[in-house]
A protein has these predicted regions:
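Conserved strand-to-loop "acid loop" that flanks and positions the catalytic carboxylate
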Residues: 412-417
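C-terminal structured domains
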Residues: 433-434
């Protein structure tokens, strides 16, 4: 396999910021998930991709530990399909961690500056079957293999070649994969809103997230009771009138339900209220341009097709038959392939989420097959999306036995009201994964790390100090 190639660019302000580019094998993640033979026999075995990481460290000379001696910590972004945050104005958690660590903002493969995927370059690799084989190479196993390649280069001159991780949401899922496949590389791990539901089935995951979204809708309507009638009226209007988004496609009632993304965070619900109140601002017979423009921004996957394409695959942990020849001793996981459009199947059993229900309920992080009919940016990917949903031979995402005996210190924040990563499932995972310690909150939502990062970092720091002092 092709080795890692490394390039970098450095700039100095109040922070030292170094941009790194790595050339890594496209298929090396399969070694973790399916075995070395699978990586070598893939039709893509001789190809490489570019992985980008930005390193940030405070140059404040009053800090206790000099910049060159600080330990490394890599940030694992939520998603899937989103790049790491940019550093135009450094503050919040990045600034805080940069005082004590060299912070690595890794763009996961297929996102940001790391060989980003689009409908154009996915369809260019071949027919739908080839596309499915290609996109399989952008899951957690490959992201962790990339992180290992980055670590080996950046920490090459360190006596202790371990680094720490901090993962938000999907970044927590990645953390559990990292602890499965390369625990020897990790000093300690921090997880926020990302204790993945590894011990249950994908259908059970969605049953719980629909339950949480129903509760969140009820809470929202208790704050803005007039919006229950307004949202239902908008949905009825969309069934009887043709309304078009700025990109030219018709807005449907079930696509309008995607505005539930506003309810995923602690402070965005007021944004949903302001959004809804503009719907008939121009008159009662049509939806306003400002409403349709805002709606268009909410429902398009133009910038992040990987999120839609790969979202359910983050729950496909291993093959349907439980057989992985390249992984000795592999046992069938609690959530094997296929996912088979799980969210859509669960939604069909929940009439209260029907778009023509007496009172409209908004959906959350749920991917439906009709996305690929109604979103122009996803239409070219419809066939490969179906193949991924039906795929039975996924590699493993986790080594459950390794996680159960884990010794790497893990500190996590889990939130009772989280509508995307269910609290009950998170606590089940925490009980399974060894040496895991959880701080819980009844007031933070899924975006807690974004809206209250320093508070949460403080709790994690204190827990980690207690663990290291034991």
């Amino acid at each position: 396999m092709v080795g890692v190639r490394f390039f970098f660019f450095k700039q100095k302000t109040a922070y030292e910021i170094t941009d790194h580019w790595f050339q890594v094998p496209l298929t090396h993640g399969l070694i973790f998930s399916k075995g070395k033979d699978a990586a070598l026999s893939s039709r893509f075995a001789d190809q490489t991709i570019t992985v980008f990481a930005r390193e940030v460290v405070s140059t404040n000379e009053t800090l206790t530990v000099s910049a060159d001696k600080r330990p490394y910590i890599v940030y694992l972004q939520g998603g899937p399909g989103f790049g790491s945050p940019k550093t135009g104005s450094i503050g919040g958690w990045i600034a805080e961690l940069a005082k004590t660590h060299r912070v690595i903002l890794l763009d996961q493969r297929g996102t940001g500056m790391s060989s980003p995927l689009s409908a154009r370059n996915i369809t260019a690799v071949g027919d739908a079957q080839v596309q499915a084989e290609y996109t399989e190479l952008f899951r957690a196993d490959s992201i962790i293999a990339d992180a290992e390649a980055v670590r080996e280069v950046l920490l090459a001159d360190r006596a202790d070649k371990r680094w720490s991780t901090i993962g938000q949401s999907f970044g927590g899922f990645l953390t559990l994969s990292y602890l499965s496949f390369a625990p020897q590389s990790l000093r300690d791990c921090r997880i926020t809103a990302g204790l993945a539901p590894i011990r249950t089935s994908v259908d059970n995951v969605y049953q719980h997230t629909f339950d949480r979204m129903k509760e969140r809708n009820e809470e929202y309507y208790s704050w803005f009771p007039e919006d229950a009638e307004l949202a239902t009226r908008i949905a009825e209007h969309l069934r009887t009138h043709k309304e078009y988004l700025p990109t030219g496609e018709r807005l449907t009632d079930h696509r309008f339900q995607m505005a539930g993304h506003f309810l995923g965070g602690r402070w965005r619900e007021r944004g949903l209220h302001y959004f809804l109140e503009t719907a008939f601002a121009e008159g009662n017979d049509h939806l306003s341009d400002q409403f349709l423009t805002a709606m268009g921004a909410e429902v398009t996957f133009q910038a992040n097709p990987l999120y839609a394409l790969m979202h359910e695959t983050i729950y496909a942990d291993g093959p349907a038959d439980g057989v992985l020849p390249g992984i000795p001793g592999y046992e069938l996981s609690p959530s094997p392939a296929p996912t088979n459009w799980s969210a859509a199947r669960v939604a069909a059993s929940r009439p209260e989420f029907a778009p023509d229900a007496d009172r409209l309920l908004f959906t959350g992080e749920h991917i439906f097959p009709w996305y690929y009919e109604e979103d122009p940016s996803l239409r070219p990917l419809a066939e490969v999306a179906n193949l991924l949903a039906e795929k039975k031979d996924w590699g493993r995402l986790y080594d459950h036995a390794q996680l159960h005996k884990n010794e790497v210190p893990v500190v996590a924040a889990a939130y009772n009201p989280d509508v995307y990563v269910d609290f009950e499932h998170s606590m089940e995972t925490a009980r399974w994964v060894g040496n895991t310690h959880v701080w819980t909150s009844k007031t933070h939502h899924h975006d807690g790390f974004g809206s209250d990062s320093l508070t949460i970092l403080g709790h994690l720091k204190n827990m980690l100090a207690e663990v290291h002092n034991q």
